[in-house]
């Protein structure tokens, strides 16, 4: 019962904070619990959910390439530019940090920090126009760095 209350609070905060992806996720979990399907679906989501979520996210990010909107010459030119090199370095760093974070939350057993992470994501979505999605963090950091470099 306590878990339902926590999820409802997170749902409310995510709705108020306009973090739609978080709200949909929480609502789906609550519905699964209410239908009694949690004992069947939660173990699979717990085990494979992150993987399949990343697969879908990666596929969505690769759509411009799949549609032919990004050509090989564009990639080549980008890879040798300041923005491209910075993107590679930041992607390397954030991917490494994501792995460290995932191990911290799962292997090291600090899943209790998840509500704070969700709240931070929701607050950033509500007040800063952010999007609570992992790989997009890299492009956000990149955009800020590029903006700083262009100002100087």
UniProtKB/Swiss-Prot annotation:
The entry's keywords: Cell membrane, Membrane, Transmembrane, Transmembrane helix
Domain of life assignment: Bacteria
Transmembrane domains' residue ranges: 5-25, 50-70, 82-102, 117-137
Membrane topology: Multi-pass membrane protein
Main location (coarse class): membrane
Compartment list: Cell membrane
Pfam families: DUF441 (PF04284)
InterPro entries: UPF0756_TM (IPR007382)
CC per GO annotation: plasma membrane
Record family assignment: Belongs to the UPF0756 family.
Protein name, UniProt field: UPF0756 membrane protein CA_C0092
């Amino acid at each position: 019962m306590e878990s339902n209350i926590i999820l409802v609070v997170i749902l409310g905060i995510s709705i108020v904070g306009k973090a739609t992806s978080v709200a949909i996720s929480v609502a789906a979990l609550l519905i699964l619990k209410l239908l009694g399907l949690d004992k069947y679906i939660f173990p699979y989501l717990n085990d494979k959910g992150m993987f399949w979520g990343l697969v879908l996210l990666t596929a969505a990010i690769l759509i411009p390439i799949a549609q032919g909107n990004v050509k090989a010459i564009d990639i080549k030119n980008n890879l040798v530019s300041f923005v491209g090199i910075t993107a590679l370095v930041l992607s390397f760093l954030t991917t490494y940090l994501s792995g460290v974070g995932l191990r911290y939350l799962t292997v090291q057993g600090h899943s209790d920090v998840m509500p704070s992470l969700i709240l931070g994501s929701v607050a950033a979505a509500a007040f800063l126009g952010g999007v609570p999605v992992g790989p997009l963090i890299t492009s956000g950091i990149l955009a800020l760095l590029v903006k700083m470099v262009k100002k100087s």
